[in-house]
Amino acid sequence: VNSKKNTSFNFADDMYYGDSNYVDWKSGNYTEKGLGTGNSLYIWQPAYQGIRHLSVFLNNIDMNKEFSEPEIADMKGQAHFLRAYCYWMLIRSFGPVPILPDEGIDYTKEYDEIAYPRNSYDECVDYISNELVKAAMLLEEARGPQDIVRPTRGAALSLRSRVLLYAASPLFNGKAPAEVIAALVDKSGKKLLSDTYDERKWAIAAAAAKDVIELGKYQLYVAYKSEGGSSLSDPATITPPDDEGTFHSNPWPKGWQNIDPFKSYRALFDGEVSAYGNSEIIFTRGTNQGAENIKVMVIHQLPRSQGGGYLSLIHISEPTRPLY
């Protein structure tokens, strides 16, 4: 769970689902920075700040004498992952963006000397993909509970898979509207978005997805069937209706006969399962961090007259109120 609002680096998508500024968003009353520093469009500045910090780190970490070689290697992997992630957030929001030199920029120079043009979308994808390969080669395969928020090899390969899937999709693979392709041309006449379809991009994306699958580390979380305990926190499993086939009579993973399908889904969102215990998580910011954690989100879903709920656009519907 991320938040009841987006953050600049939401791990899901770029949809805005906050409650307090819905009218402004719907009416288009926002700038290129979004509706404030807590919203999904406020990405440009923090992303490039992060890229600069990460480049400085990568260019200087080898001078450190306090950390061991394995520790330095892992930190380098994290830095390559995060630099790729920052660029991913940028191209997801703005399309082709400038790729800055890995050695960094001398900000004491005049603006014209350090103003870099936009790279093409394919160039951005290639850079991000290469960064994630470097990260995957250095990162650990798994993290302990105290380091659950740090990226792993699976996180790097998964992000690479998503980036390459987007690159293969029609909008970025020669199928964008002609007026969009024509508009994405820099001052030198360089096309920033390809107008040529390339079937190979799908093969590359499929191979990247296979790299993740072959790790064998991720699977759906399931809660097993219960006859019910002595407390309300352990209710008996509500048996789903029979399907037309044999799924209802087969044990997991070929059916739901021995699991609780509803609880398997519910437990992922009500705080019952920790980030460390969730076998579906690939990259996470942790469990219940910040002021807008699961407890607060639940309160926002309650009616104001029931249990001290807050004003929110995600309140339960009126017919459901008697259940509270």
Task: Give the label of every model feature segment.
Residues 17-94, 111-148:
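Conserved, well-structured interaction surfaces
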